[in-house]
Amino acid sequence: MNGPIIMTREERMKIVHEIKERILDKYGDDVKAIGVYGSLGRQTDGPYSDIEMMCVMSTEEAEFSHEWTTGEWKVEVNFDSEEILLDYASQVESDWPLTHGQFFSILPIYDSGGYLEKVYQTAKSVEAQTFHDAICALIVEELFEYAGKWRNIRVQGPTTFLPSLTVQVAMAGAMLIGLHHRICYTTSASVLTEAVKQSDLPSGYDHLCQFVMSGQLSDSEKLLESLENFWNGIQEWTERHGYIVDVSKRIPF
């Protein structure tokens, strides 16, 4: 296995159409639509990019996938019923800016009834309150927890974990910003560079990202100071935008 190897877009698309024909031969009328997503769907694939496809099925509760490599290239094909796919497209979790970009750049390969457009419209039409709730949950479930971790490191170590924790905090901050602006990042590799270009960032976020993007993660004191500044910036930013985190003085159940 010596891959992935360099391939052209034309070579990838030839494979896509071979897979499409195999899907139609195997599942026949059960197939409603087939599309390509990811960099290939956006037409921004690089020489080593993989192939990602989605298949909308008429079978209720269909939900399975195939992922394989030939040793030279890799493919993932997800099979979902229309109901399951639409439900997932309407969900907003903390990683929505990374997971749901697929629904905004689907390249249709086979679509007998406009199903992929329906998926796109569903993802596009999520209510503002859903994003609001996801932001509040991210602050509590991820960022608040990370703050406890870096404060523990300041008190008792180990500082060896601080560089990777700083990367995690920067990524969580990017998810916060993506949810606020309701944008999906192009790729996981471009998350931070795209996040810092957005308007209305929490104070301290850009400075924190500079450490991560430059790889300057060896000075523990500077990292801890930057993390605290970002956390303070989040407090002011959330209050300004009305993201009220529920605080319970008692056990809530």
UniProtKB/Swiss-Prot annotation:
Record's cofactor remark: Binds 1 or 2 Mg(2+) per subunit depending on the catalytic state, the liganding residues shift as catalysis proceeds.
Entries under Gene3D superfamilies matching the protein: Beta Polymerase, domain 2, Nucleotidyltransferases domain 2
Outcome of swapping T130K: Increased thermostability
Keywords in alphabetical order: Antibiotic resistance, ATP-binding, Nucleotide-binding, Plasmid, Transferase
Annotated binding of kanamycin A, by residue: E67, K74, E76, E141, E145
Region entry C-terminal domain, spans: 128-241
Record GO terms (molecular function): nucleotidyltransferase activity
Binding-site positions, Mg(2+) B: D50, E52
Thermal activity characteristics from the UniProt entry: Thermostable at 50 degrees Celsius for about 14 minutes, at 55 degrees Celsius for about 2 minutes.
KW Hydrolase (keyword) present: no
InterPro entries: KNTase_C, NT_sf
EC number: 2.7.7.-
Miscellaneous comment: Although some of the cross-references in are mapped to other bacteria, they are probably all derived from the gene originally encoded on plasmid pUB110 in S.aureus.
Domain comment quoted from the record: Bilobed; the N-terminus has a 5-strand beta-pleated sheet while the C-terminus is a helical bundle.
Protein purpose: Inactivates aminoglycoside antibiotics such as kanamycin by catalyzing the transfer of a nucleotidyl group from a wide variety of nucleoside triphosphates ((d)ATP, (d)CTP, (d)GTP, ITP, TTP and (d)UTP) to the 4'-hydroxyl group of the aminoglycoside. In vitro, antibiotics without the 4'-hydroxyl but possessing a 4''-hydroxyl group (e.g. sisomicin and gentamicin) are also modifed but with poor specificity. The 3' position of the NTP ribose ring does not tolerate large substitutions (e.g. ddATP) and dNTPs and TTP are better substrates than their NTP counterparts.
Record-given protein name: Aminoglycoside nucleotidyltransferase (4')
Organism lineage string: Bacteria, Bacillati, Bacillota, Bacilli, Bacillales
